[in-house]
Swiss-Prot record:
Gene3D superfamilies the UniProt entry points to: Winged helix-like DNA-binding domain superfamily/Winged helix DNA-binding domain (1.10.10.10)
Annotated GO MF terms: double-stranded DNA binding; RNA binding
Protein name listed in UniProt: PCI domain-containing protein 2 homolog
Stated family: Belongs to the CSN12 family.
Length: 413
């Protein structure tokens, strides 16, 4: 963003950009209304109720944009001077509502201003998170914390309805191109408050949007597939999770190393469940060495090492929200261990004692025969092992061919 000398210059620059009415000018105005831009730190812009003062340095020719800018200055004052994120969040919602009512709903033959709207929504999420932190520190605890995210979601959803009902089809006019960005905004909010079920109609709308999908920005497509993949992982849909996360990783710019790393945090467990283990070089390249020991232990079928690896790097995995997901890798670890036992025995009838001895060898001493049978029965039910239990003879009878199918073939069935 170019240097802003004073408040008059600030209004002038926004006013001049409004005349252009292009997507590029919308991008530039969005920066002038961003809470993370350099201008936000300038003390001369930290003004409360600027719109009500009589000493206005400059009024934009666009009255609605002018009002939005004045409210933005009020937000800057609340954030930097009053240190009141709750009030800031409330004002930001007013901005979103005003933008919806006066711009999205009334300016029917244009959409150049959508980058401004995207920025306003992103800042609303940031303020909602800050307000939630402030509220959780009050005496009332977390009782009202989610209300900030919910009020943000409500405001964005109202805008979503406005955009999807737009009758225009032309790329330079239709507001439907905002669908994917708003879906991503709501994805992030619902992840925060654990209400991913509310995303079902939004996902269905994207699935059925037809040629419109090609008009969405690649950045939004990458983000959407990342969020969709994360949700699918937690839903247990490994095929959809892999599809979404692989798309996100491949289309994320090479220079965006931090974003690729975020994608891999979820793609690695998905690939492991499908039997594809990441290389040590990949983990090291993206600073994900926390996975190294987990990967090695699962491959070796060493349950004790899996538990130790999860314990050692538990804080990292919990922060990423994948600790419980990684715990489910124990099933694959059992499968890999039992496959090794079957290869050592070299027969289709394997005594259960052999499996129990192997478990003790890898540090699992608390599994009795009944629990062992239950573990094997689950592996058979999940089609990770082809065979049956001969309970009376205390043996596992495995198929003569492909007794341990590839995990990817099992997950695709």
């Amino acid at each position: 963003m170019s240097f802003v000398r004073n408040i008059s210059d600030y209004f002038n620059k926004i006013d001049n950009l409004c005349y252009n009415q292009s997507w590029e000018s919308g991008d530039k105005i969005a920066k002038y209304l961003s809470l993370n831009d350099d201008h936000s730190k300038e003390a001369y812009l930290h003004i409360s109720e600027y719109g009500s003062t009589s000493r206005r340095c400059r009024v934009s020719e666009d009255e609605i944009i002018d009002e939005i800018v004045c409210l933005h200055l009020h937000v800057l004052h609340s954030v930097h001077v009053a240190k009141d994120l709750i009030s800031s969040q409330s004002t930001q919602i007013r901005i979103i509502q005003l933008f919806n009512k006066e711009i999205l709903q009334k300016r029917k033959d244009e959409n150049w201003f959508l980058p401004i709207f995207y920025r306003l929504c992103t800042d609303l999420r940031w303020l909602s998170k800050g307000a939630e932190s402030c509220a959780s520190g009050d005496d009332e605890g977390d009782s009202n914390a989610n209300s900030f995210f919910e009020s943000a979601a409500k405001a964005i959803t109202e805008c979503y309805r406005t955009c999807v009902s737009d009758v225009h089809a032309e790329e330079g006019k239709t507001k439907k191109v905002a669908m994917l960005n708003m879906t991503n905004q709501l994805f992030q909010i619902y992840f925060q408050i654990n209400k991913l079920n509310l995303l079902k109609p939004l996902i269905r709308a994207i699935d059925n949007c037809g040629p419109l999908y090609n008009k969405f920005l690649m950045a939004d497509k990458v983000a959407y597939n990342y969020f969709l993949g994360r949700k699918a992982l937690f839903d247990g849909d490994l095929i959809l999770a892999e599809k979404g996360l692989v798309y996100a990783f491949r289309n994320c710019p090479t220079e965006s190393v931090s974003n690729k790393r975020k994608i891999l945090v979820y793609l690695i467990p998905v690939k492991m469940f499908l039997g594809h283990m990441p290389t040590a070089s990949l983990l090291h390249r993206y600073r994900l060495d926390e996975f190294q020991e987990v990967v090695a232990a699962v491959k070796d079928g060493h349950l004790g090492r899996v538990d130790n690896a999860l314990l050692t790097n538990g804080e990292f995995f919990i922060k990423c929200g994948i600790y419980l997901v990684l715990e489910k890798l124990r099933t694959i670890t059992y499968r890999n261990l039992f496959k090794k036992v079957s290869q050592m025995v070299g027969k289709v009838q394997i005594p259960l004692d052999a499996f129990q001895a192997a478990l003790r060898f890898v540090g699992v001493t608390d599994v009795d025969m009944d629990e062992l049978e239950c573990i094997i029965a689950n592996l058979i039910a999940e089609k990770k092992v082809k065979g049956y239990l001969a309970h009376q003879h205390q043996k596992l009878v495995i198929s003569k061919t492909n007794a341990f199918p590839t995990l990817s073939s099992v997950s695709s069935n």
